[in-house]
Amino acid sequence: YPGHLPKIQFDGRGGIVISNNMNYIIVEGFEVEGPAQDINYEMAEADRDYKIEVAEDEDDSTNYNHSYFSGKGIWGGYGAHHNIIIRNNIVHDTCGSAIRFNDSDHILIENNIVYNSNWWTSSASSAIVLAESVAVSGDNTDDIKMIIRGNIVYNNWNRIRFYVTQLPDNSGNNNPNYGTANFQSIWDGQGIYVTRSDPEY
């Protein structure tokens, strides 16, 4: 209904997750709240330690899947999407990114309020992210297709040292400790982050 702001509270991989192969979608007028207020530094550091233990135990039957500490507010998973509009939402207290799209094209993110994201993840995420954008129809022209505008974004920062089980090939960092258990830096946590787009995009 006009003027209503339905609230979605989540503690898993995402508040609103757009499934693979879903395109031409508008997500508008929601409040999405993650579990960040229920987590503290000791819990998040213990989760990072557990992630390292599971990743380095050489036991293929164990894997890390604690999405509680990295869940995203509104995102497209890791599948490609195009022609998506995310507008007039309030997204907050997400442990991972508030709004994120990977491998996507023709994305509009506008007039959202985003705050208190990324506090408890060791995955080096940021509040609003467009990662590895691709031209889904091969239209590598001068058209502006990925638009982030009119958002209010604040108090989004990482508190936990970066660790990742496997770096992407295009990470662009030559530090041998980057993202390993020995890495002692807190990484990323920006308000808006556009990264690693397809070279021909």
Show where each model-derived region lies.
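Right-handed parallel beta-helix
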Residues: 5, 10-194, 199
